[in-house]
Curated annotation (Swiss-Prot):
Designated name of the protein: Cold shock protein CapB
Biological role: Affects cell viability at low temperatures.
PROSITE patterns named among the record's database cross-references: CSD_1, CSD_2
Gene induction: In response to low temperature.
Cellular component annotations (GO), alphabetically ordered: cytosol
Main localization category: cytoplasm
Keyword field: Activator, Cytoplasm, DNA-binding, Stress response, Transcription, Transcription regulation
Length: 69
């Protein structure tokens, strides 16, 4: 079981449905809108603080179970 981490949204493109999160330590992580845990429109804004679980995806590290904090 992975530990939750925190980070900052680097950027997120609503039209394409993905972006990147800069964790407190380590390299930037890919984030897809399906990984965002919220009701309604799933989006993030640049500079938002988030918590997430880092997992290895097909193309590298990505954020899952993303929550705005």
């Amino acid at each position: 079981m992975s530990n939750r981490q925190t980070g900052t949204v680097k950027w997120f493109n609503d039209e394409k449905g993905f972006g990147f999160i800069t964790p407190q330590s380590g390299d930037d992580l890919f984030v897809h809108f399906k990984a965002i845990q919220s009701d309604g429109f799933k989006s993030l804004k640049e500079g938002q603080q988030v918590s997430f679980i880092a997992t290895r995806g097909q193309k590298g590290m990505q954020a899952e179970e993303v929550q705005v904090i």
